[in-house]
């Protein structure tokens, strides 16, 4: 019998602390959907962001590099898509990859993310949902 791979769903909500969710015991935050996901998955309780700036933090997550190594302080560097990418590693391991929502992997100038489809492929995503 072939073993199927577990799904990997990475939810990143703009540097939200892990304890600001119902499943983590917060009595103010009402997060029923996250609570259900956490009940059947993994929550990284000791994970910290590299930056309070979302674009900088996302670049660190994508590349595995610290801020002083990738140099992105405000606007992502599109050339980083040619380097190491955890999404590309996941895709190369046989998973289908996709992204939903904002990603800030290029300067936002309005328009449609589909205009950057080739860049998403270079980062390692199969599709922009």
Describe every region a protein language model picked out.
Residues 1-129:
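Formylglycine-dependent sulfatase
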């Amino acid at each position: 019998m072939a073993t199927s791979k577990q799904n990997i769903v990475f939810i990143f909500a703009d540097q939200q602390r892990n304890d600001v969710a119902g499943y983590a015991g917060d009595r103010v935050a009402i997060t029923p959907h996250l609570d259900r996901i956490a009940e059947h998955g993994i929550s990284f309780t000791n994970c910290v962001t590299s930056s309070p700036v979302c674009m900088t933090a996302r670049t660190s997550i994508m590349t595995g590099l610290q801020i002083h190594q990738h140099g992105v302080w405000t606007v992502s560097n599109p050339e980083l898509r040619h380097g190491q990418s955890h999404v590309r590693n996941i895709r190369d391991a046989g998973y289908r990859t996709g992204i939903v929502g904002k990603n800030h992997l290029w300067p936002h100038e309005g328009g449609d993310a589909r205009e950057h489809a080739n860049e998403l492929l270079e980062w390692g995503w199969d599709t922009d949902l």
